[in-house]
């Protein structure tokens, strides 16, 4: 059995998957913030419960936001302060007496989708998350590409390209990102960025779901906004796809529920790609909230 943990600032979610990659059991508990030992106990207790339930010693994989293992072997995860700065992988491996694998949660999302029965035919899969932020991951031949700093797929921290400024106007404000840089595309293409763009052009403060509801009702202002957003997304993706050249692009995060993104993006991309480039197949993520657990469990399928 394969145990996949999706760990975030508020919850620890465990999913148990069988050899056919089907979910057999899941459980969620709050993420402890009081101490590192309490955090370790929470993970180990879930593993012990799963071992007892299934009568096996399951393989453990963990997806967590941040850098799973820095040069000195410690975790960097600002959203999980009880474990950040600690040698999480080594400590869990010792306590659980088994190999524990860690990766960035966005890489786990991409891995989950790449191992979907419908998508395993594609050798190079790009996962793109359009949610609270913008991120993603790359999977080549069923294995995540992590890089030495675990930042492969941090697409949200690419800067706005020149074509974006041509589209939006050269007086378009370059916003300072939480990473400290100016003009990161996350500030415009995330769910919050989607809402910020609307406020910038129309001086109305609405959340993304409210704007999308107006679009569905045929509101002309919302329609113009969505057209502008999709054009900006295509411009930014043009740079990324030219570098990555994936066979499949899977889009997740809250904005992936907006069907216009997956249905209208393909037609906008060719003018931002090389003439010989092929537009990848574009699909909405299949596994929703279970994607993080799936991808973490499947870290043991990448040998």
UniProtKB/Swiss-Prot annotation:
Keywords, in A-Z order: ATP-binding, Carbohydrate metabolism, Kinase, Metal-binding, Nucleotide-binding, Transferase, Zinc
Pathway: Cell wall biogenesis; peptidoglycan recycling
Nucleotide-binding is among the record's keywords: yes
One Pfam family named in its UniProt record: ROK
GO BP terms, alphabetized: N-acetylglucosamine metabolic process; peptidoglycan turnover
Reactions catalysed: N-acetyl-D-glucosamine + ATP = N-acetyl-D-glucosamine 6-phosphate + ADP + H(+)
Protein role: Catalyzes the phosphorylation of N-acetyl-D-glucosamine (GlcNAc) derived from cell-wall degradation, yielding GlcNAc-6-P.
Family the UniProt entry places it in: Belongs to the ROK (NagC/XylR) family. NagK subfamily.
UniProt xrefs under PANTHER family: N-ACETYL-D-GLUCOSAMINE KINASE, ROK (REPRESSOR, ORF, KINASE) FAMILY
Name assigned to this protein: N-acetyl-D-glucosamine kinase
The species this protein was found in: Salmonella arizonae (strain ATCC BAA-731 / CDC346-86 / RSK2980)
Taxonomic lineage: Bacteria, Pseudomonadati, Pseudomonadota, Gammaproteobacteria, Enterobacterales
């Amino acid at each position: 059995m394969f145990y996949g943990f999706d760990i975030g600032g508020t919850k620890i979610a465990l999913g148990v998957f069988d050899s056919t990659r089907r979910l057999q059991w899941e459980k969620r508990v709050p993420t402890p913030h009081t101490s590192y030992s309490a955090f370790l106990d929470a993970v180990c207790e879930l593993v012990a419960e799963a071992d007892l339930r299934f009568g096996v010693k399951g393989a453990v994989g963990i997806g967590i936001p941040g850098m799973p293992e820095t040069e000195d072997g410690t975790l960097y995860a600002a959203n999980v302060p009880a474990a950040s700065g600690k040698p999480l992988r080594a400590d869990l491996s010792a306590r659980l007496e088994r190999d524990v694998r860690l990766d960035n949660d966005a890489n786990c999302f991409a891995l989950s989708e790449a191992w979907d029965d419908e998508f395993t035919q594609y050798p190079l899969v790009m996962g793109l998350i359009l949610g609270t932020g913008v991120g993603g991951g790359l999977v080549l031949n069923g294995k995540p590409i992590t890089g030495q700093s675990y930042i492969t797929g941090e697409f949200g921290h690419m800067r706005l390209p020149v074509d974006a400024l041509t589209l939006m106007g050269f007086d378009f404000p370059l916003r300072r990102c939480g990473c400290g840089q100016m003009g990161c595309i996350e500030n415009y293409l995330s769910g919050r960025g989607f809402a910020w763009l609307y406020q910038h052009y129309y001086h109305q403060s609405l959340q993304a779901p409210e704007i999308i509801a107006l679009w569905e009702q045929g509101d002309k202002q919302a329609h113009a906004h969505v057209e502008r957003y999709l054009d900006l997304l295509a411009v930014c993706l043009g740079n990324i796809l030219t570098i990555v050249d994936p066979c499949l692009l899977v889009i997740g995060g809250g904005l992936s529920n907006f069907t216009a993104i997956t249905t209208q993006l393909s037609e906008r991309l060719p003018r931002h790609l090389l003439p010989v480039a092929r537009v990848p197949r574009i699909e909405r993520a299949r596994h929703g909230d279970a994607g993080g657990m799936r991808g973490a469990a499947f870290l043991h399928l990448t040998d």
